[in-house]
Regions:
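Short, well-structured alpha-helical segments in soluble
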Residues: 12-26
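Glycine-rich, charge-decorated loop segments at or immediately adjacent to ligand/cofactor-binding or catalytic sites
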Residues: 13-15, 61-70
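Periplasmic-binding protein-like
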Residues: 24-35, 53-56
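Venus flytrap/periplasmic-binding-protein-like
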Residues: 38, 42-65
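Hydrophobic alpha-helical segments within soluble ligand-binding/sensing domains
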Residues: 71-92
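Short beta-strand elements in bilobed, periplasmic/extracellular small-molecule ligand-binding domains
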Residues: 1-10
Length: 129
């Protein structure tokens, strides 16, 4: 069962993270600016509770996550630019243009995985730094 938790700012992040950690075996945090700026709050709650956090992107994973299927903001921007060119040149109709996806990179946070005693499957790259 998946449960959604919401917070409006960094002031609520601590209590919401605590509630989520208390009620779940693992957490998924999508790409979110508030979490990205406050990964220490999430890590300070989830790691001592032995609750793995799976992150929506590498920056959050580096701060509080165990693993991510990370997007490349460069690749995403490049693909978006290519789509914009097609629209501006009249080669595509924005209302019928299909959504395009970029590849993801499998990455993990060795320190947190080690602290939680997790073995990472083959095919994941260690997050540097």
């Amino acid at each position: 069962t998946a449960t959604q938790y919401a917070f409006s700012d960094s002031n609520a992040l601590s209590s919401v993270s605590q509630e989520a950690a208390d009620e779940n075996d693992a957490l998924y945090v999508p790409t979110d600016n508030t979490v990205a700026a406050n990964t220490g709050i999430v890590d300070g709650i989830c790691r001592p509770a032995k609750k793995p956090v799976f992150a929506g992107e590498e920056g959050i994973c580096a701060g509080c996550g165990v693993a991510t299927l990370s997007i490349s903001y460069y690749d995403l921007g490049y693909t978006t630019g290519e789509m914009a060119v097609k629209i501006l040149n009249g080669e595509a109709d924005i209302s019928t243009m299909p959504i395009e996806y970029t590849d993801v990179t499998k990455k993990y946070n060795k320190t947190i995985c080690d602290d939680l005693g997790l073995t990472v499957p083959d095919g994941y790259e260690e997050i540097e730094g």
